[in-house]
C-alpha cells in the first residue's frame, strides 16, 4: 500500500536531502525519479527532489487525500457531501486538470475543530431568548425600560444529535428536528435543508426555518458560512506548531516553488459583493483560469453583511487563517454583540421575526461560470440586477458615474441614502436601466434600488475631491507634517520622513515594530517616494528642496551607505526585554542590508529627482546626472542583494525606465551591465512557473515587475499568464467602492499594491469587443484608435480589437444566403506586414494603413488579423 504524504509534509520535506527520500516513497514521484535520474546526475539531491515534485501536477501531488462519502453530479459540477456534518465538502469540475476543490474541508484546511463546525452547509444563528412573556415596551418619560431577554447562539455545528441526513433521488437532505442537547445547539426552530442539481452546472441549496416555540421568535443573526479553500497559511505553518512572530510564516525559498504551485492551482480567492438580493461571491483559482464558482442568493434571499469568527472554536487551533466567511441574511445580533453600534456595516442590520409556527424559506445557488462577464448574466437570470459601472465606484466631483442595471423589470424606486447625490438621467432601454449619477462632497454615496416585488440592492460609491488637488495637498502635508527636523535625534532621522499618527495629530517616533519609524522599508520610504514621483508631474520648488535635503542629510548618509550603496533595515532600534516581540530589532539587526525590497525605493527616488532636474531645472544640490548615477548603482546593488533579488518587487518595473535614461545619456558600459542583471532576473521569472512570491505568505508585490519585465524581454506566454493572474486578484468586479478594482490580499481589500498592478492591467490593453446591433452590421469605428472596419459583402456579427497586441478578430455572416464571399476593408492600421488567418490557413499581406480582405463566407466566421 502506498505511503501517503500530507501537504504539509510535502512542503516540509522539499528542500532537504532527507526530504528527497520521503518524496520518493510516493509511487508517482519514485517512478518519475527513476526516469529522470540520468538527466539529474549533475544536480544536488536537493535540486533533483525539487525538480521531480515540480514536474508533477498539483492534482497528482494531492490525489491520495480526498475521501468523500456522497457524490452528486450537476452538469460539469461534481459535488461531494460529508454525511457526518451534513455539509458540502467539495465542489470540483469534471475534467479539471488540477482537480481543485473550491471549498474548504478538513483535508485542505487541517486544524479546524468540527465539533463546532462552520463548513459550507452549516447555519449560524443567534436568537433572542425571552426571559418571560413578551410585554409591550413602556417608553414614557418616567418609565423604566427592562430588557426582555438576552442573545443566545444556536448553530448546526452544535446540533449533531438532532441532525438527520439522507440522500435519495439525487437530493441531499439535512434536517434538524427537536431541541439539541448542547447549550448552543438549535432549540428554537426546525431547520430543513436540501440540495439538488440546477440548470447547467449548478447546485441549488434550499433552506427553511420554522419557529417551534410558543412565542414570537427573533433571529438576530442568520448567517451561512462559505468555507472557501483559501487557507494559504496552512502551506507555511505546522499544525499546532509555534506561530511565526514576524507574521510571514516559514518563508523557506527552497520550498517556495512548490508552495506557489499549490497556491495557484489548489487554492482559491474569494471576491464578495454583499449588498442585498444581487449579492454574490466569486471563487476562483489565483491562476485566474475559468471556470469560476459563483455563489449567489436567489428567490427572496438577500445578504446584508459578511464577517468572520476568528475566535470561534472552529478556528482556534489555526495559524494565519481566520476562518470562513459568514454570509449574513440577518445581522442585528452581530452588530450588538460585536458592539458595532457606532460603526454599523454599510447595508445596515436587521432581524427576522417569526410568529409561532411561521416558516421562512431561502435559497442559494452555486454555479460554474465560464467568464467574469457571466457574473452579471447569472445574477440577472435569478431576477436580480446585473450591474456595470463606468468609470469607477470612486468618483471625483464633477465626473459622471454611468450605471447600467440589467434586470427583468424596471427599477421601482431609488432611495438616496447619502447627501448630495444627483440622478441626472434615468432611462429604460430594453432590459436595462441606465443611470447617470453625479456627487458632491467627499464621502460615501449610497443608493438603495428597489425592484421586483420587494427586492433591494445597494450601490455604495465614494466621492473624492479633484485628484490633482489631492496629490498636491498630499505633497504639502508630507513636507509640513512628516519631514523630521530634530538635528539631535540619536538615530540619525534628522531630515528623514516619519509616519503621522492621526489619533494624536503628530508624527510618531516610537513603534513596537521599529521599521515603521526607521526611515527604511515600505513604512519609511512611502512618503519620500510619493513626494519624488509627485514632483515629476506637479513640481513645487519647496518640495524639491526638501527632497534634496532628505537625500543629503539622511537617505544617502545614514540609511544608504554612500560608499557601498548598501541600504540598512532601519535607523531606529530597541534594547530588547525578555518579553520583547520580533519587531524589537536590536542595533545589529537594524543595520542588516539583505532585504532586496529596500533597494528599489531609493533607486526610484533618485531616478525621480533625475527627471525633475531634466524637466524643470529645480535641483540645487546635485546635477540630474548625479542622481541617475546613484540610481544606477542602487539598481546594481538591488539585483545582487538578498534572497528576493530575482522576484518581482513593488515599483521594480521602473528599472526599465532607468535603463532607458542611462542609454539616453550614452552610458554604454552602465547600460550593458544593468541590462545583463535585468535579463538574469527576467529569465528566472520566465523559468519559474509562478514567480509571484514574496517575503510573506501571500502577497501582490511581485506581479507588476513580472508583467513589465516579461513584456520588455519578449516572454509573451509568461506575460499573458501574469495578466491572467493579475485579473484574478480583482476578479469579482464587485460594484462597491472598497472592492471595485482593488486587489484582494487574503482578507484585505484596498491593498497598497493595487495601483501598481493596475498599471500592468492598463498597459496590457484588454481588447475592445463589440457585438453589432445597429440592424445593418456593415460598419464599426473604434473612435479613440481611429480604426474603421467596413464590409461590402456579408455582415459583421462581432469584432475584437486589441491595440496593444495589434490584432483584429472578426466574426462574419450573411443573412441573405447569397454572398459567397466576405469582403471587408480596414482603415487606420499601423503600416507594415500582417498575418491574415481564416479557414485553417494564413497568409502575409502588406498594408500602408489600409487592408482589404476577401474570404469564403464559410471561413469568415473566424477571421484573425495580426501584425507580423
PLM regions and their residue ranges:
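Beta-strand-rich recognition/accessory modules
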Residues: 49-66, 71-73, 84, 265-393
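Carbohydrate-binding surface patches
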Residues: 782-830, 854-861
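Extended, loop-rich substrate-binding clefts of extracytoplasmic carbohydrate-active enzymes
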Residues: 64, 125-206, 212-214, 330-350, ...
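C-terminal beta-strand-rich structural cap/linker in extracellular carbohydrate-active enzymes
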Residues: 371-373, 846-868
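N-terminal export signals
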Residues: 9-30
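Low-complexity, Pro/Ser/Thr- and charge-rich linker/hinge segments at domain boundaries
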Residues: 231-237, 378-398, 456-499
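Polysaccharide-binding surfaces and accessory modules of carbohydrate-active proteins
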Residues: 50-54, 61, 68-70, 105-118, ...
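Catalytic cores of extracellular degradative/oxidative enzymes
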Residues: 478-748, 752, 756
Amino acid at each position: 500500500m502506498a505511503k501517503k504524504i500530507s501537504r504539509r509534509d510535502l512542503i516540509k520535506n522539499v528542500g532537504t536531502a532527507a526530504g528527497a527520500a520521503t518524496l520518493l516513497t510516493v509511487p508517482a514521484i519514485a517512478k518519475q525519479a527513476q526516469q529522470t535520474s540520468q538527466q539529474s546526475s549533475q544536480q544536488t539531491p536537493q535540486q533533483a527532489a525539487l525538480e521531480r515534485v515540480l514536474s508533477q501536477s498539483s492534482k497528482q501531488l494531492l490525489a491520495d487525500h480526498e475521501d468523500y462519502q456522497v457524490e452528486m453530479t450537476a452538469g460539469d459540477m461534481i459535488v461531494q457531501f460529508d454525511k457526518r456534518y451534513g455539509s458540502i465538502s467539495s465542489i470540483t469540475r469534471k475534467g479539471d486538470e488540477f482537480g481543485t476543490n473550491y471549498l474548504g474541508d478538513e483535508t485542505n484546511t487541517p486544524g479546524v475543530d468540527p465539533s463546532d463546525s462552520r463548513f459550507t452547509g452549516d447555519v449560524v444563528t443567534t436568537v433572542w431568548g425571552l426571559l418571560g412573556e413578551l410585554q409591550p415596551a413602556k417608553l414614557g418619560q418616567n418609565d423604566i425600560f427592562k430588557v426582555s431577554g438576552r442573545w443566545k447562539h444556536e448553530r448546526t455545528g452544535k446540533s449533531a444529535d438532532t441532525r438527520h441526513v439522507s440522500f435519495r433521488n439525487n437530493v441531499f437532505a439535512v434536517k434538524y428536528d427537536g431541541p439539541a442537547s448542547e447549550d448552543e445547539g438549535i432549540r428554537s426552530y426546525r431547520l430543513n435543508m436540501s440540495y439538488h442539481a440546477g440548470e447547467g452546472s449548478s447546485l441549488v441549496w434550499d433552506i427553511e426555518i420554522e419557529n417551534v416555540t410558543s412565542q414570537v421568535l427573533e433571529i438576530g443573526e442568520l448567517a451561512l458560512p462559505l468555507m472557501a479553500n483559501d487557507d494559504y497559511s496552512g502551506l507555511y505553518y505546522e499544525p499546532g506548531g509555534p506561530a511565526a512572530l514576524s507574521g510571514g510564516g516559514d518563508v523557506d525559498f527552497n520550498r517556495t516553488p512548490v508552495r506557489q504551485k499549490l497556491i495557484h492551482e489548489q487554492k482559491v480567492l474569494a471576491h464578495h459583493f454583499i449588498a442585498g438580493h444581487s449579492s454574490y461571491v466569486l471563487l476562483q483559482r489565483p491562476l485566474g483560469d475559468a471556470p469560476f464558482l459563483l455563489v449567489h442568493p436567489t428567490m427572496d434571499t438577500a445578504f446584508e453583511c459578511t464577517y468572520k469568527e476568528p475566535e470561534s472554536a472552529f478556528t482556534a487551533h489555526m495559524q494565519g487563517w481566520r476562518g470562513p466567511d459568514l454570509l449574513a441574511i440577518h445581522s442585528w445580533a452581530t452588530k450588538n454583540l460585536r458592539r458595532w453600534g457606532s460603526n454599523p456595516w454599510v447595508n445596515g442590520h436587521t432581524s427576522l421575526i417569526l410568529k409561532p409556527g411561521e416558516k421562512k424559506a431561502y435559497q442559494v445557488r452555486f454555479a460554474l461560470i465560464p467568464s467574469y462577464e457571466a457574473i452579471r448574466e447569472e445574477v440577472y437570470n435569478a431576477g436580480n440586477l446585473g450591474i456595470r459601472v463606468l468609470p469607477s465606484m470612486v468618483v471625483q466631483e464633477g465626473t459622471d458615474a454611468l450605471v447600467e442595471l440589467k434586470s427583468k423589470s424596471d427599477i421601482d424606486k431609488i432611495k438616496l441614502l447619502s447627501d448630495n447625490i444627483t440622478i441626472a438621467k434615468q432611462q429604460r432601454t430594453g432590459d436595462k436601466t441606465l443611470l447617470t449619477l453625479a456627487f458632491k462632497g467627499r464621502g460615501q454615496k449610497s443608493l438603495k434600488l428597489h425592484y421586483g416585488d420587494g427586492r433591494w440592492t445597494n450601490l455604495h460609491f465614494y466621492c473624492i475631491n479633484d485628484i490633482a488637488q489631492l496629490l498636491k495637498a498630499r505633497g504639502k502635508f508630507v513636507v509640513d507634517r512628516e519631514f523630521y527636523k530634530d538635528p539631535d535625534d540619536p538615530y540619525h532621522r534628522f531630515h528623514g520622513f516619519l509616519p503621522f499618527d492621526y489619533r494624536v495629530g503628530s508624527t510618531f517616533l516610537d513603534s513596537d515594530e521599529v521599521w515603521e519609524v526607521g526611515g527604511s522599508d515600505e513604512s519609511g520610504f512611502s512618503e519620500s517616494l510619493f513626494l519624488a514621483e509627485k514632483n515629476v508631474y506637479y513640481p513645487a520648488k519647496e518640495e524639491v528642496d526638501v527632497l534634496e535635503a532628505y537625500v543629503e542629510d539622511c537617505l544617502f548618509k545614514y540609511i544608504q551607505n554612500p560608499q557601498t550603496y548598501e541600504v540598512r533595515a532601519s535607523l531606529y532600534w530597541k534594547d530588547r526585554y525578555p518579553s520583547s516581540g520580533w519587531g524589537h530589532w536590536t542595533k545589529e539587526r537594524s543595520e542588516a542590508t539583505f532585504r532586496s525590497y529596500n533597494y528599489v525605493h531609493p533607486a526610484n527616488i533618485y531616478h525621480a529627482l533625475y527627471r525633475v532636474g531634466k524637466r524643470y531645472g529645480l535641483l540645487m544640490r546635485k546635477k540630474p546626472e548625479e542622481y541617475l548615477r546613484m540610481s544606477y548603482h542602487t539598481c546594481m546593488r538591488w539585483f545582487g542583494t538578498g534572497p528576493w533579488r530575482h522576484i518581482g518587487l513593488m515599483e521594480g518595473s521602473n528599472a526599465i525606465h532607468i535603463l532607458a535614461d542611462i542609454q539616453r545619456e550614452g552610458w554604454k558600459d552602465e547600460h550593458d551591465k544593468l541590462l545583463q542583471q535585468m535579463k538574469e532576473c527576467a529569465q528566472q521569472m520566465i523559468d519559474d512557473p509562478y514567480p509571484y512570491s514574496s517575503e510573506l505568505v501571500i502577497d501582490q508585490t511581485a506581479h507588476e515587475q513580472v508583467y513589465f519585465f516579461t513584456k520588455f524581454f519578449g516572454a509573451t506566454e509568461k506575460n499573458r499568464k501574469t495578466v491572467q493572474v493579475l485579473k484574478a486578484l480583482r476578479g469579482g468586479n464587485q460594484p462597491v467602492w472598497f472592492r471595485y478594482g482593488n486587489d484582494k490580499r487574503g482578507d484585505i481589500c484596498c491593498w497598497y499594491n493595487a495601483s501598481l498592478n493596475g498599471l500592468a492591467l492598463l498597459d496590457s490593453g484588454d481588447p475592445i469587443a463589440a457585438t453589432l446591433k445597429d440592424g445593418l452590421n456593415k460598419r464599426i469605428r473604434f473612435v479613440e484608435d481611429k480604426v474603421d472596419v467596413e464590409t461590402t459583402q456579408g455582415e459583421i456579427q462581432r469584432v475584437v480589437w486589441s491595440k496593444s497586441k495589434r490584432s483584429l478578430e472578426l466574426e462574419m455572416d450573411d443573412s441573405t444566403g447569397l454572398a459567397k464571399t466576405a469582403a471587408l476593408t480596414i482603415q487606420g492600421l499601423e503600416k507594415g506586414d500582417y498575418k491574415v488567418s481564416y479557414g485553417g490557413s494564413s497568409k502575409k499581406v502588406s498594408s500602408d494603413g489600409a487592408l482589404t480582405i476577401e474570404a469564403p463566407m464559410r471561413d469568415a466566421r473566424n477571421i484573425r488579423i495580426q501584425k507580423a
